[in-house]
Amino acid sequence: VLVHAVRTSQELVYQELIANLQQEYRGKLTYIPIVSREKHQHILSGRIPALLRDGRLMQAANLFPDKHNSFFYLCGNPAMVHDTRDVLLALGFAKHLRRSKGHFSFENYW
């Protein structure tokens, strides 16, 4: 599942590339665009932490992660990464460390 969150729909770049990858990996790549400052009929609206916390993100992906089979990779705005990490911890997921396997890893990209 690729979750691509931006402020406005104009920032949803790489649409052609993502569509080609979805075609190539038919049924193996789910793409979920999210905008935080606009409302669109076929795009989730809000911030990733809130959408994860209230279940709308998982519902859109048609996946319900569990601690045995799920791994999250977070990359982006440091505030989003921090807030999403906090939600994952509150949901019982653990940070992946070299010395102990966890459920998520992250990097800040700005």
Feature locations, PLM:
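Reductase modules of NAD(P)H-dependent flavoproteins
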Residues: 3, 8-110
